[in-house]
A protein has these predicted regions:
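Short acidic loop-to-helix transition motifs that present clustered carboxylates
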Residues: 26-30, 39-42, 90
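Acidic glycine/proline-rich low-complexity segments
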Residues: 28-33, 51-84, 117-154
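Beta-strand-rich binding/interaction modules
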Residues: 6-27, 55-62, 105-127
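Outer-membrane beta-barrel proteins
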Residues: 34, 46-48, 71, 98-100
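Short beta-strand segments of immunoglobulin-like
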Residues: 1-2, 96-102
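Proline-enriched interdomain boundary motifs that mark the N-terminal boundary
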Residues: 90-96
Length: 154
């Protein structure tokens, strides 16, 4: 899902039950809903927000009416579903304005900017390409590192 999109959730349940749906990140409860369930499937939706990126977990607790005899399911059932949420506002596109080649001992001028003008912090490292080739080093994608899936922690 992308920030701003509707997230549609379908919960199987019994009539006259309740579902407590908690939207959780790795460190906090972002939102929660108490839903009246219908026989069969119950659907509801909510909007994906920026604080749900890079992922959230839907922690669903389904509670049936006490002393019901319609089915033999437990009174309480639990389930957790992970959801990925993409926030395009977190993607940075740094640009370098510099000479095509650098020579040892020579002065160099490098201008660093972000394509969309977003604020960013950066570290600049100048490394010999031959050294990187010897070690088969592949330059990592920082966004994939900092916005990888978080473990549930609530």
């Amino acid at each position: 899902y992308q920030v701003g999109e509707n997230i549609e959730v379908t919960i199987p349940g019994s009539s006259q039950g309740k579902a407590l749906v908690s939207v959780e990140t790795g460190s906090q409860v972002v939102d929660n809903f108490l839903i009246q369930t219908n026989k069969g499937n119950t659907s509801f939706s909510f909007k994906a927000t920026a604080d749900m990126a890079p992922n959230v977990y839907l922690n669903i607790t389904l509670i049936q009416p006490h002393a019901q005899t319609v089915n033999d399911l437990p009174i309480r059932m639990y389930g957790i579903v992970p959801l990925k949420v993409y926030d395009p506002g977190t993607v940075l596109s740094p640009q370098l304005d510099m000479a095509g080649e650098l020579a040892p001992g020579k002065e160099v001028s490098i201008k660093v900017s972000e394509k969309e003008g977003k604020a960013m912090a950066y570290t600049l490292a100048i490394v010999d390409e031959g050294l990187l080739d010897i070690t088969n080093f592949e330059t990592p994608d920082p966004w994939n590192h900092f916005y990888k899936r978080e473990a549930i922690g609530v």
